Amino acid sequence: MPVLMPSADVPTIDISPLFGTDPDAKAHVARQINEACRGSGFFYASHHGIDVRRLQDVVNEFHRTMTDQEKHDLAIHAYNENNSHVRNGYYMARPGRKTVESWCYLNPSFGEDHPMIKAGTPMHEVNVWPDEERHPDFRSFGEQYYREVFRLSKVLLLRGFALALGKPEEFFENEVTEEDTLSCRSLMIRYPYLDPYPEAAIKTGPDGTRLSFEDHLDVSMITVLFQTEVQNLQVETVDGWQSLPTSGENFLINCGTYLGYLTNDYFPAPNHRVKYVNAERLSLPFFLHAGQNSVMKPFHPEDTGDRKLNPAVTYGEYLQEGFHALIAKNVQT
């Protein structure tokens, strides 16, 4: 069962000290992260150094210029049986039934010579990109942005979350590397404005709220989200479902299920959902993951030796099972 969060307060935290060397300033950020993760489970990261205006411009141009044929040719196996990819590719809208569409790409380090690719390891794929002539510089931007947001996420996780959990800054260092991370960037989740909007594409929550995507927990270590400034997210709290504020400048951060598992729910993954809003908007999440063979020993910061802790598991196995469970619950996105 998901943990019901105590509040829906979402603080904005200046994370710039995490890039520096002042231990007191870092400790101050860590205390704020701790409070946020044990409050609503969400916080906004400001002073992150990423050009979100250009990000939106590139994403909007991509959607404007993609043809239906291109989308189908690049679609993952769930939408195009001729494509073996299950992660990297296009996730198509289905007229009258599903309006959201997205493009997902994975670690640019996964080339044909990568050991996991050679071994045919599940969840590892070499990215296929849209045609360069039709979408000039799209791939170069995507790969550059992936590395920027990965490094931002790693700083948040390594220096922020580790300190917030009472661990040394380098606690996660060897488990999350740019060469092997399973992290994915669903760069382009697009929610369209439609008139009329198909009723079959709208879901209804148990409380009667109309939804675009039902309640779920993110299968990740942490999620780093930028979205356009249209209110849509809700978190499940002890007082029921409550709306989260928006920001047109900052990244929304929350713990995924693995950090909840690793900390025995000291930092739980917040249960959240997407309200139905008939408005053109973008949702651009980065899901930070460890590597396939990473194994971390679960702990609890307040454990005195009498607490039953989760067993250690291989990250790749954990992620694959988590994805299958998410799709089974919420259907293919």
Curated annotation (Swiss-Prot):
Domain Fe2OG dioxygenase intervals: 180-290
PROSITE patterns from the UniProt entry: FE2OG_OXY, IPNS_1, IPNS_2
Keywords: Antibiotic biosynthesis, Iron, Metal-binding, Oxidoreductase, Vitamin C
Residues the record lists as binding N-[(5S)-5-amino-5-carboxypentanoyl]-L-cysteinyl-D-valine: R87, Y91, Y191, H216, D218, S283
InterPro entries reported for this sequence: DIOX_N, IPNS-like_FE2OG_OXY, IPNS-like_sf, Iron_ascorbate_oxido_reductase, Isopenicillin-N_synth_CS, Oxoglu/Fe-dep_dioxygenase_dom
Spans traversing the lipid bilayer: none
EC number: 1.21.3.1
Keyword Flavoprotein on entry: no
Pfam families, sorted: 2OG-FeII_Oxy, DIOX_N
Pathway linked to the protein: Antibiotic biosynthesis; penicillin G biosynthesis; penicillin G from L-alpha-aminoadipate and L-cysteine and L-valine: step 2/3
Chain positions recorded as isopenicillin N binding sites: R87, Y91, Y191, S283
Listed cofactors: Fe cation; L-ascorbate
Residues the record lists as binding 2-oxoglutarate: R281
GO biological process, one term: antibiotic biosynthetic process
Annotated binding of Fe(2+), by residue: H216, D218, H272
Molecular function via GO: iron ion binding; isopenicillin-N synthase activity; L-ascorbic acid binding
Catalytic activity: N-[(5S)-5-amino-5-carboxypentanoyl]-L-cysteinyl-D-valine + O2 = isopenicillin N + 2 H2O
Record function comment: Removes, in the presence of oxygen, 4 hydrogen atoms from delta-L-(alpha-aminoadipyl)-L-cysteinyl-D-valine (ACV) to form the azetidinone and thiazolidine rings of isopenicillin.
Family recorded in the similarity comment: Belongs to the iron/ascorbate-dependent oxidoreductase family.
Protein name, as recorded: Isopenicillin N synthase
Native species: Streptomyces microflavus (Streptomyces lipmanii)
Lineage: Bacteria, Bacillati, Actinomycetota, Actinomycetes, Kitasatosporales
